[in-house]
Amino acid sequence: NKNITTTTINGKVYAKILFVVGLEHNNYKENISNVEKINDIANKYYPGLSRGIYKKEGPGVDGIYNQDISSNSILIELGGVDNNIDEVLNTTEAISNILYYYIKG
């Protein structure tokens, strides 16, 4: 549903983001910590862009997503099937700014 995957911030339409963290590896707490910081930055600069952090584990679920390779590995889902390319491109620009602020500290 487009109203779940879309937001407007300062007149610009974005595909919302969802951070996914797999819990089926030894270092998942570090991944969660990093994603929480990134999510906080997203909420500060782009309120309403993030749908939050989805923690995945359990039978039939890939609870790793290569996040066991590095605590800096993140998975960000953008929008949904109803979003258009302009909304997704607006979001990729926002993500680049969010990651810049995260790396900059």
Predicted regions and their residues:
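Active-site-adjacent mobile loop/cap segments within catalytic or ligand-binding domains
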Residues: 51-105
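Solvent-exposed, acidic/flexible segments
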Residues: 12, 24-35, 81, 85-92
